Each structure stands twice: as structure tokens, then as C-alpha cells.
């Protein structure tokens, strides 16, 4: 386990987070969202790598390296980094990395060069009919200090701020129809609790079309009959109440990101779970969300609020910076 690098100076970060890289202001907490790449903001990338590694290690994952930066962050056509910046404290409070499906490269075997390609198989239908209109999301994190209730409203709305950034992407890139990403659970999470969550997700969101499948699917260890009897309702809401109660009985909560994704869209697709062996053996569940099926209250908050801030984005995309509009 390597020692994590020292923080990057605030002055250096501010110099790289120039106005042309700012995507929008957040709805809550008066934070700012930027989109950068390793090539145009190498020091911000280092700070992201530092904060990611701290957050993931604390949860039981991470790379074990001095910072979490991999080949997908630094390749020729790299993943873009969406970060939330707190201008008062002059620090990053969270982020995502993403790649637009129409920019995905393919290797000599015809496999997409995606960060999830070592864990999931992609069907021809997905590659042809979905991928060109999809944004792949990954490495979602909230800085450790902002995960605490001590952070007050800044911490409370960190995840909400990240959704604001994703909402803006759907406006600036109108051909984006889907978000593909992963819900991460850690090996330290209670096994029976994990099995309940995965069974519940598969029952209510399981993909019947096999668009994407895990190469080595994670098997549920808990007795299936017991889970079947436990989650006995057709209704998502009734089964969810049971899930929440049973997980709490074990002394755990449903992970915040799992809750957040479930509350985004009733038609989310779940593709099964794979173990990410190079990243602390975390358990990654693949999901797909259709932008036009995001629930109205979320759409108004994260997407339509951006249109109000940037009406020009609906006519031409000049309101966004060059990384997004190239």
C-alpha cells in the first residue's frame, strides 16, 4: 500500500480551473462544476486521483497506489472528469469521470475501450443501438470530509451537485439518451444485506434482453427461496420498505448511491454484478438509465435548471466550453 500524495496547492488548482472549463453552477450550496481532462489540467487530475484514492480506501476499495489514476484517465482520448468545486473553501468536493459513447474507440478484437470492458460483455445490440447514444460513468466519489454530517449542507448536497453536472451534459449533448454506470458495494458490507439488495434490484430492474452481462457473475449466497418469500410484493414501494427495514436490522443502511440511482428512474435496467479485482475486489453492478425516463422532479431539478442558467445551450452549444462542444 503506497502512501497517498500530498494535496495539490489551491493556487495551482484555481489556475487550472479556468472559466472556460466551468460547466455550470450547482442548484444548491453555490458550488461550481467543471469538466477537465488530464491533458488540459494535469494538476487537477492529480488532486482528483488523490481524493478518489482516499475516499475509496476508506470504504474498503482503491488501487493501493499513491493516487487513483489509470490508463482511461490519461489515454489519447481520455475520460473527461466532471468535478464539483467549493469556491469558498477552494477545494474539490466530489466528481465523476465519463466518456461519450460516440467517442469510444474499439481495439483490434472489436472490443470497446471502456473502463468496464474487463468486467462486462457488451452485446451487438448494445454496441450498435445504445452505445453511440450513451455516456459511460465511473469513479463516482464524494471527498471524505463532505461525506460527514459535520460538513452540513455542503456535504448533504454533494451527490445532488454531481447530478446537476450530469443533467447539464444531456442538454449540451442532445444525442445522449442513456447513462451507463455501476453501483459499487464493498466486500466489508454485510453479505446477507448485499444479497437482499442485489435480489431486490434484479427483481424490479433486471434486464431481460441481455444487453450487457457480467463476465464472471457474482452469485448470491443467501437462500433464494428465503429472499423470494421476503420480497413477496409486485410493488416496488412495498418491497423497498421491506428491504430498508431488513438491511437496517443488520445494522447497515442501503448505500447512498444505490438509493440515488433507484430514485432516478422507474425503468432503470440492472445487468448483474461483477467483481473488480484490480480495485480492492469491490462488487460492481451494471445499470442503464434512459434520460427521457428520469422522474420529473429529478429532471426539473438537474436538467431544466441548467436550461434556465444557459438558454443559449438550447439553440447552439456555445454556452459550454470547448471540451464539451468539440
From Swiss-Prot:
Keyword Transferase: yes
Signal peptide: none
Pathway membership, UniProt: Lipid metabolism
Single GO MF annotation: acyltransferase activity
InterPro entries: Acyl_CoA_acyltransferase, Ornithine_N-alpha-AT
UniProt keyword annotations, A-Z: Acyltransferase, Lipid biosynthesis, Lipid metabolism, Transferase
Family: Belongs to the acetyltransferase family.
Catalytic activity: a (3R)-hydroxyacyl-[ACP] + glycine = a lyso-glycine lipid + holo-[ACP] + H(+); (3R)-hydroxyhexadecanoyl-[ACP] + glycine = N-[(3R)-3-hydroxyhexadecanoyl]-glycine + holo-[ACP] + H(+)
A GO BP annotation: lipid metabolic process
Pfam families reported in the protein's UniProt record: Acetyltransf_5
Enzyme Commission number, as recorded: 2.3.2.-
Transmembrane segment boundaries: none
UniProt source species: Phocaeicola vulgatus (strain ATCC 8482 / DSM 1447 / JCM 5826 / CCUG 4940 / NBRC 14291 / NCTC 11154) (Bacteroides vulgatus)
PANTHER family assigned: GCN5-RELATED N-ACETYLTRANSFERASE, L-ORNITHINE N(ALPHA)-ACYLTRANSFERASE
Impact after mutating residue 139 to A: Loss of commendamide production
Function: Is involved in the production of glycine lipids (GL), which are phosphorus-free membrane lipids. Catalyzes the first step of GL biosynthesis, i.e. the N-acylation of glycine via addition of a 3-hydroxy fatty acyl group, to form a range of monoacylated glycine (also named lyso-glycine lipids or lyso-GL). As an example, catalyzes the production of commendamide, an N-acylated (3-OH C16:0) derivative of glycine with hemolytic activity and the ability to solubilize cholesterol micelles; this compound can also activate NF-kB through the G-protein coupled receptor GPCR G2A/132.
Stated name of the protein: Glycine N(alpha)-acyltransferase
Amino acid at each position: 500500500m503506497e502512501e497517498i500524495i500530498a494535496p495539490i496547492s489551491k493556487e495551482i488548482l484555481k489556475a487550472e480551473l479556468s472559466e472556460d472549463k466551468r460547466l455550470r453552477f450547482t442548484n444548491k450550496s453555490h458550488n461550481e462544476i467543471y469538466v477537465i481532462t488530464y491533458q488540459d489540467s494535469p494538476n487537477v487530475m492529480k488532486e482528483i486521483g488523490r481524493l478518489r484514492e482516499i475516499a475509496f480506501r476508506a470504504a474498503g476499495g482503491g488501487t493501493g497506489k499513491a493516487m487513483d489514476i489509470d490508463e482511461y484517465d490519461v489515454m489519447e482520448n481520455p475520460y473527461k472528469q466532471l468535478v464539483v468545486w467549493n469556491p469558498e473553501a477552494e477545494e474539490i468536493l466530489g466528481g465523476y469521470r465519463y466518456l461519450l459513447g460516440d467517442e469510444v474507440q474499439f481495439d483490434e478484437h472489436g472490443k470497446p475501450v471502456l473502463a468496464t470492458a474487463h468486467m462486462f460483455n457488451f452485446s451487438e445490440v448494445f454496441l450498435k443501438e445504445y452505445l453511440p447514444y450513451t455516456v459511460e460513468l465511473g469513479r463516482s466519489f464524494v471527498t471524505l470530509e463532505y461525506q460527514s454530517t459535520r460538513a452540513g449542507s455542503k456535504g448533504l448536497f454533494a451527490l445532488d451537485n454531481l447530478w446537476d453536472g450530469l443533467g447539464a451534459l444531456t442538454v449540451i449533448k442532445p444525442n445522449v439518451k442513456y447513462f451507463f454506470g455501476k453501483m459499487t458495494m464493498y466486500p466489508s458490507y454485510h453479505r446477507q444485506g448485499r444479497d437482499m439488495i442485489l435480489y431486490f434490484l434484479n427483481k424490479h430492474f433486471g434486464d431481460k434482453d441481455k444487453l450487457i452481462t457480467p463476465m464472471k457473475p457474482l452469485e448470491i449466497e443467501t437462500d433464494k427461496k428465503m429472499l423470494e418469500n421476503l420480497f413477496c410484493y409486485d410493488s416496488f414501494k412495498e418491497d423497498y420498505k421491506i428491504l430498508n427495514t431488513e438491511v437496517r436490522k443488520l445494522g447497515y443502511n442501503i448505500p447512498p448511491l444505490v438509493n440515488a440511482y433507484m430514485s432516478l428512474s422507474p425503468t432503470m435496467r440492472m445487468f448483474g454484478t461483477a467483481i473488480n479485482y484490480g480495485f480492492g475486489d469491490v462488487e460492481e453492478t451494471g445499470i442503464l438509465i434512459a434520460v427521457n425516463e428520469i422522474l420529473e422532479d429529478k429532471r426539473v431539478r438537474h436538467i431544466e435548471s441548467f436550461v434556465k442558467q444557459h438558454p443559449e445551450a438550447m439553440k447552439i452549444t456555445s454556452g459550454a466550453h470547448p471540451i464539451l462542444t468539440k
